[in-house]
Amino acid sequence: MKTNCVVKLGQLRRTDLRPAALILGRAMRDNPVNVRAFAISDAERRSRALERFFRPVLLGLHQRGLIYGAYRGNALVGICGIARPGFCQPTPLEKLRVLPAVVFGNPLGAALRVVNWADAWAHRDPAGPHWHLGPVAIEPSVQRQGIGSALLTAFCVHMDAYGAVAYLETDRRANVHFYQKFGFAVVAEADVMGVPNWFMSRPGGHPRKG
């Protein structure tokens, strides 16, 4: 699929997950919850820690859902993860795979903070069927060029085609306004480790006919 910001969208393969984790590490380096959870003051070290963390996270999500990428030429520049209804939360095996990435090479207490963060989000996960959006990230050097909007537009087209409910979490106020443009509304707010978080839902539309 081509978009008006000259990118192509496609589903990621397992071999694409490492470059996707690199993008997440760079793009989400300064997200407030990530800063608080990993407690690494040096930005580059924090970026590398997040890359290690997201490798097993993406592997699990790849098995439970879909991960779409945005490409310029052959370069991956954005990702959009989606968990299928009923498969939002990581399995016990996934949690074990993530554990070394948060225990080794990170400050003492990082693992416990990540667990508390994950539990806080899981506790608020809607009971009804829904597609769970996230993570969504764009390579920092090409942000604000319409790539995120292209990914979200494609996501919403799929949701509307099935009349499906979508749900997400974010720790950035700017993201709240971004997602509202695509029909999401805030359904709850809470502090997670002292960081404001917003929980958003998008109602299911009418399935397309034909």
Residue ranges and their predicted role:
Residues S149, A161-Y162, R172-E189, M193-P196:
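Conserved active-site alpha-helix within GNAT-family acetyltransferase domains
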Residues Q63-C80, E139:
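Conserved beta-hairpin
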Residues P129-W131, H158-D171:
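Conserved GNAT acetyl-CoA-binding A-motif
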Residues M1-R18, L22, R26:
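Conserved N-terminal entry element of GNAT/NAT acetyltransferase domains
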Residues R48-G69, G128-H132:
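A short helix-loop-beta-strand connector motif used in the catalytic cores of GNAT acetyltransferases and
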Residues L76-A137, Q143:
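Conserved acyl-donor/pantetheine-binding loop and adjacent beta-alpha core of acyl/acetyltransferases
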Residues A164-R173, V192-G210:
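C-terminal "cap" of GNAT-fold acetyltransferases
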Residues I138, R144-V157:
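Conserved acetyl-CoA-binding loop-helix of GNAT-fold acetyltransferases
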